[in-house]
Regions:
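Tandem amphipathic alpha-helical repeat scaffolds
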Residues: 7-17, 51-55, 93
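Helix-turn-helix repeat elements of alpha-solenoid scaffolds
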Residues: 14-32, 64-70
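Alpha-helical scaffold segments of alpha-solenoid architecture
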Residues: 23, 44-199
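Charged/polar interaction segments and conserved charged motifs
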Residues: 1-16, 98-99, 103-112
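Hydrophobic, well-ordered secondary-structure segments
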Residues: 3-10, 22, 26, 45, ...
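Flexible helix-coil transition and linker loops at the boundaries of alpha-helical arrays
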Residues: 1, 32-40, 77-79
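Alpha-helix boundary/capping segments in eukaryotic regulatory proteins
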Residues: 1-3, 16-23, 38-43, 60-63
Length: 200
């Protein structure tokens, strides 16, 4: 059953970095959305989705985290809330970490979708860069351009993880395509400044 206390519990676990307690809280993280306590209001639901998504991010269960953030974004609302903005930022990162394509068409209202993207331009830019052919280079450029925003939001670590995964994916792709590529060419194709950086 979904209760107003779920979000509080998840938030405390995250604040204390009690990841073993989060892993043991599968009852909260797996509760069906139809079983709702009468005292639950819209803010409780949004917070539960947000902190549940963050908990799943901490447990590295990225596809599930993306679904939880998407639930917060698709909840009916007449105005954009700070919780929805924070959920959109984490949603963008979770979908990139899950190697999924962010689908904003499932959000409930076009105005909400527009407002969320406008409020979160740095994250919308990340999603757009990930879809490009040379995603590793594009992501690195976007990360550099919006670095202060990611730091301010407390998402710099997740953004760095997204960037590193894009570089690793590019390296795997090149390794499959070219088995006899010189290290210098490999470094420039991935976007490293020199051979030494590629060796690390």
């Amino acid at each position: 059953m979904i209760t107003p206390q779920d979000a509080c519990y998840l938030r405390v676990c995250l604040k204390l970095k009690a990841y073993d307690a989060l892993a043991a809280s599968d009852g909260i993280l797996a509760a069906p959305a139809m079983d709702v306590a009468p005292a639950l209001d819209a803010t409780d639901f949004l917070l539960r989705c947000y902190y549940g998504g963050r908990a799943l991010l901490a447990l590295r269960r990225y596809p599930e985290a993306a679904r939880w953030f998407q639930n917060a974004l698709s909840a009916p609302a007449t105005a954009l809330s700070a919780i929805a903005v924070a959920a959109y930022k984490k949603y963008a990162l979770a979908t990139l970490l899950a190697d999924a394509v962010a689908d904003a068409s499932t959000f409930s209202a076009p105005a909400k979708k527009y407002s969320t993207s406008r409020e979160c331009d740095a994250y919308a830019s990340l999603l757009a860069a990930a879809k490009k052919r040379d995603a590793a280079k594009e992501l690195a450029d976007v990360v550099e351009r919006h670095e202060a925003t990611y730091e301010l939001d407390g998402n710099a670590g997740l953004v760095a993880l997204v960037r590193d995964r894009a570089v690793a994916a590019k390296a795997r792709s090149l390794a499959k395509t070219y088995s006899t590529l010189r290290l210098g060419d490999f470094a420039s194709a991935i976007g490293f400044s020199d051979v030494e950086a590629a060796e690390r």
